[in-house]
């Protein structure tokens, strides 16, 4: 089973790992809810690592993206930008195992350095925390439960089991902003 570093440190953006397996991805495995990876079968690979900080798609949230660098390729001492790398385009979890959908092959037992697209991850963290704040305020004020949540690259939506008026929504927004301005510690 893959060690899930994102549960230990949600701010971790770089990590070391070893490739456990790398196989060609099946066509249905390389399409996400946005249709991002709609290429032909065989163009993408599923890489399983012994540990990862890449958060997989789930819970209404799309997967992290980023890069896997070959750790043993120092390319004459140059930085990561000059190293051999593959793009991590999607991440899926199946039966406790996490698979990174990439645009290139990496041999099993290869040491890699993972680098998460931090700007994207941080944006998702903020939106996810905001969803919890808004949902909690709506539940406390009106008793409605959050029955659906979607965090996408362009928007964030929440579904509740009751109607919320424009006036009520403005009040909730003001209360949510107050909570953010207080800069309270977030526990995960």
Label each PLM-derived region with a short phrase.
Residues 1-188:
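A glycine- and charged-residue-rich anion-binding loop/surface
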């Amino acid at each position: 089973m893959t060690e899930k570093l994102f549960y230990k440190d949600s701010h971790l953006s770089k990590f070391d790992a070893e490739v456990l397996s790398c196989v060609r991805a099946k066509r249905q495995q390389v399409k996400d809810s946005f249709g991002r990876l709609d290429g032909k079968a065989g163009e993408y690979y599923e890489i399983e690592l012994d540990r990862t900080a890449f958060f997989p798609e789930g819970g209404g949230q799309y997967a992290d993206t980023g890069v896997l660098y070959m750790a043993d390729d120092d390319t004459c001492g140059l930085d990561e930008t000059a190293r051999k790398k593959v793009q991590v385009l999607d991440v899926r979890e199946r039966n406790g195992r996490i698979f990174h959908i990439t645009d290139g092959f990496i041999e099993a037992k290869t040491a890699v350095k993972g680098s998460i697209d931090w700007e994207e991850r941080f944006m998702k963290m903020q939106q996810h925390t905001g969803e919890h704040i808004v949902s909690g305020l709506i539940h406390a004020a009106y008793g409605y439960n959050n029955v659906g949540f979607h965090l996408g690259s362009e928007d964030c939506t929440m579904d509740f089991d009751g109607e919320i008026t424009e006036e009520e929504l403005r009040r909730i927004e003001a209360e949510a902003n107050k909570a953010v301005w207080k800069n309270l510690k977030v526990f995960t």
